[in-house]
Amino acid sequence: MTDSPQPIQLIVGLGNPGDRYAGTRHNAGFWLLDELLRRHGGALRPERRYHADLATLHLGPHQCRLMRPQTYMNRSGQAVGPYAQFFRLPPESILVVHDEIDLPPGQVKLKQGGGHGGHNGLRDIIRALGNERGFCRARIGVGHPGHRDGVVPYVLSRPAPDERRAIADAVEELADCVEWLLAGDWGRACQRLHSRS
């Protein structure tokens, strides 16, 4: 994390569109967008030129855009890249929210910059931003199946009730921190989220 991160202007929740994938671990980014809209109102509307549904979030004195790509996960850059380019968004002002198999259910970690860590959605966004890796990430833990051969069916399935509750609790806590992220107060958000057990 840098000492003075940019205020977030765009929150991108990653997932796969369609009822088949609703509630799956891979759609953890969508879970956050749903929680923010439930709390603060608004509705996502299709924007075909960006291959995404978009909404504006008003939170205190701050506002930002919410994006739910309507591409499949592996093509998330088709939504994020053109939007960031058109509005000239610095990568540091973009928060990408995604599932993280290397964290247990119930944990959330914030990170600024870095590689894709094998996550195909992040890989495609990095490619679409011209190999720019400086965008921010909120990594929502969904747990690991125990062996790499089981990762794809695991993330594309729905969690057991106890895991679902842990992930939902983490999403709610991340939603509590969004106003700080919009203000650029990463230290406060990290202190709260990274102290979760």
Swiss-Prot record:
Where in or outside the cell? Cytoplasm
The alphabetical list of record keywords is: Cytoplasm, Hydrolase, RNA-binding, tRNA-binding
* Reactions it catalyzes: an N-acyl-L-alpha-aminoacyl-tRNA + H2O = an N-acyl-L-amino acid + a tRNA + H(+)
Q: Tell me which SUPFAM superfamilies the record gives.
A: Peptidyl-tRNA hydrolase-like
**Record site feature (Stabilizes the basic form of H active site to accept a proton), residues:** 99
One GO MF annotation is: tRNA binding
Q: Which residues form a coiled coil?
A: none
* Top-level taxonomic group: Bacteria
S-S pairs: none
Gene Ontology process terms (BP): protein quality control for misfolded or incompletely synthesized proteins; rescue of stalled ribosome
Q: Where is this site: Discriminates between blocked and unblocked aminoacyl-tRNA?
A: 16
UniProt-annotated catalytic positions: 26
The record's GO CC annotations read: cytoplasm
Q: Identify the EC number(s).
A: 3.1.1.29
Q: What is its main location?
A: cytoplasm
Q: Per UniProt, where does tRNA bind?
A: 21, 72, 74, 120
Family indicated by similarity: Belongs to the PTH family.
Q: Which NCBIfam families match?
A: pth
Its function, per the record, reads: Hydrolyzes ribosome-free peptidyl-tRNAs (with 1 or more amino acids incorporated), which drop off the ribosome during protein synthesis, or as a result of ribosome stalling.
Oligomeric state and interaction partners are given as: Monomer.
Name of protein: Peptidyl-tRNA hydrolase
Query: What organism is the protein native to?
Result: Alkalilimnicola ehrlichii (strain ATCC BAA-1101 / DSM 17681 / MLHE-1)
